[in-house]
Amino acid sequence: MKRTYQPKKRHRQRVHGFRKRMSTSNGRNVLARRRRKGRKVLSA
């Protein structure tokens, strides 16, 4: 059985990246929440 996680840099950025997060209001909520929590890394 093949493993489910087959990493691709482009896919990771496009789905979970900073610009993707900034492009929607909910994504901006995610970033704000992570800033409030004090995360060192905000997005992929």
From Swiss-Prot:
This is Large ribosomal subunit protein bL34. InterPro entries: Ribosomal_bL34, Ribosomal_bL34_CS. GO terms for molecular function: structural constituent of ribosome. GO terms for cellular component: ribonucleoprotein complex; ribosome. GO terms for biological process: translation. It comes from Ligilactobacillus salivarius (strain UCC118). Residues 1-22, 31-44 have a biased composition (Basic residues). Gene3D superfamilies: 1.10.287.3980. Residues 1-44 are annotated as: Disordered. The keyword Ribosomal protein applies. Pfam families: Ribosomal_L34. Belongs to the bacterial ribosomal protein bL34 family. Keywords: Ribonucleoprotein, Ribosomal protein. The lineage of its organism: Bacteria, Bacillati, Bacillota, Bacilli, Lactobacillales.
